[in-house]
Amino acid sequence: MPFKKLKPLLKDILEHLNIEDATPFQKGAIPKIKSGANVYAIGSENSGKTTALILTTLQKLKDYEEHDNPRILIFVKDKNAALTLQEKFEVFTKHMNLTLYSVYEEQAVQVQKDIIYEGVDIVIGTAKRLAKLYLSNSINLNDMNTLIIEDAQLLPRIDFGADIVRISESFPKCQYVVFSTEYDEKMKSLRNSFMANSVKVEA
């Protein structure tokens, strides 16, 4: 079972949340993501994608290590999605020595730059704002080891996809994980251009 190989703290939190068994999607996706492979994880609504995203992200990070720069970037569609995901993460991170921060267009770049400079482990944000921070040297991604896209259905939008690709091209050794609710023709084409050597998990 995927949960058995998680950190004890994560298992304790799952137990506290009354989450005992992994969903079929989580059984397929969590081991693949933990292996370090680039993964397209396709699951229906309520399949447990968000929990899988959070667990694999926190499993990868060592909360006792000192890092000033972000190690995880998570792309979401808008401010609402960023804050919602951050809130779900904080159910877990309030028990850990890890910091996360959300960035989006509705807040000043300088404010975001200053907070990130103080030290953030996980940055959640819109593609447009993350690209702006990166291209203006307002975010140091030298320690980044994972780039996650919460919903691949957003990628076919030209501006969204271009912003992500622009960042990803600078970090070829990074792990890429893309979540989606479906795997259609657009996704097949996208996989060939964005993550050609990825593993696809579908449940």
List where the protein language model places each region.
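Beta-edge loop/turn motif
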Residues: 26, 45, 125-129
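P-loop (Walker A) phosphate-binding loop of NTP-binding proteins
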Residues: 42-45, 77
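Walker A/P-loop NTP-binding motif
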Residues: 27-39, 48-67, 90
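Conserved catalytic network of the ASCE P-loop NTPase/AAA+ motor domain
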Residues: 32, 63-68, 93-96, 114-118, ...
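Conserved nucleic-acid-binding Ia/Ib motif block in the N-terminal RecA-like helicase ATPase lobe
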Residues: 67-125, 129, 144
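Post-DEXD/H (motif II) to motif III coupling segment of the RecA-like Helicase ATP-binding lobe
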Residues: 141-203
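Hydrophobic/aliphatic anchor position in the core parallel beta-sheet
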Residues: 39, 72, 100, 146, ...
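Conserved pre-motif I regulatory segment
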Residues: 1-42
